[in-house]
Every structure is written in structure tokens, then in C-alpha cells.
């Protein structure tokens, strides 16, 4: 009986979603899809973000994207996307950090240090438009 109880608890914990996964599912998945591959011609994939986060200014840029959205042409993997990503300023600082950590770990397979709520708070204190957020994107190869 004890083994069965342990197995049920263990499996239940394994199925529990992280906060980042929950935020992604509720706010990002519709456009970027459950697998982070996006929709061709409409919404870019998120699998390349390790290159972005490693670039100078990349961490701040990714936070700005979530907080302020994006508007204007964006080239990812040789393909241009020209849509609008809405801002998600309603998310708490810890939720923004969690969703970025989820995306980087799961889709980009990044080993970048985790984002913190303090980093998000620092970017939230600055005013950016979706167009200005896009212009702050670091060059990536």
C-alpha cells in the first residue's frame, strides 16, 4: 500500500506544471504553439532564443518583449515575420521571469542563467513601445 501511495504522489508531482509552463500555456501558446515552433508566416518560433539571450543586451530585450510586446518586421531563421505581439504588463515580475525561464529551458535548450523578478522589475521601470522594444533587439547570428 505504501508503494502505491508513493507512486501516486510521485506521478502527481511529475505531472504538475511549473509556473512558467502555466503562464506560457495561458498567454503564449496560442501564437507560438505548444512546441514553441510558432506559425509559419505569422508568429516566429522561440527555439532560437538561446542566441538572443547570449547576445549583449539580450536578457533585457527578452524581458522587454514580454512586457511591452513587439511591432514591426522581425527576421528569425532567415524568415521575416511582421505581426504584432501584445504587451503582457499585467503579468507579475515573477511570472515574466518564470515564462522566460520556461521558454529558454524547454524550447531553446539554453543553459543561460535564470531570469529573476528583480531583472524584470528593472525593465518594467523603463517605458518602451512595441516598436522601441523591437529596435532594442541585439544582433544575432
Where are these regions (language model features)?
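Positively charged n-region of N-terminal signal peptides that target proteins for export
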Residues: 1-4
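Electrostatic cytochrome c docking/interface patches
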Residues: 10-24, 38-39, 50-54, 134-135
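Solvent-exposed, acidic/flexible segments
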Residues: 17, 39, 59, 92-96, ...
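Stable alpha-helical elements in mature extracytoplasmic
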Residues: 19-24, 58, 62, 95-96, ...
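The canonical Cys-X-X-Cys-His
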Residues: 24-34, 85, 99-102
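Gly/Gly-Pro-rich "capping" loops immediately C-terminal to redox-active cysteine motifs
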Residues: 38-75, 82-91
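Flexible coil segments in periplasmic/lumen-exposed cytochrome c-class electron-transfer proteins
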Residues: 76-77, 83, 88-141
Amino acid at each position: 500500500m505504501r508503494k502505491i501511495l508513493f507512486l501516486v504522489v510521485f506521478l502527481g508531482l511529475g505531472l504538475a506544471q511549473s509556473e512558467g509552463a502555466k503562464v506560457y500555456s495561458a498567454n503564449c501558446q496560442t501564437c507560438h504553439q505548444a512546441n514553441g515552433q510558432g506559425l509559419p508566416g505569422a508568429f516566429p518560433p522561440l527555439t532560437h532564443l538561446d542566441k538572443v539571450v547570449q547576445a549583449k543586451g539580450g536578457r533585457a530585450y527578452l524581458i522587454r518583449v514580454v512586457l511591452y510586446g513587439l511591432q514591426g518586421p522581425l527576421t528569425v531563421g532567415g524568415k521575416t515575420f511582421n505581426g504584432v505581439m501584445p504587451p503582457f504588463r499585467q503579468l507579475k515580475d515573477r511570472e515574466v521571469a518564470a515564462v522566460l525561464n520556461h521558454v529558454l529551458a524547454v524550447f531553446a535548450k539554453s543553459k543561460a542563467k535564470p531570469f529573476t523578478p528583480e531583472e524584470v522589475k528593472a525593465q518594467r521601470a523603463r517605458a518602451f513601445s512595441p516598436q522601441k522594444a523591437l529596435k532594442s533587439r541585439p544582433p544575432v547570428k
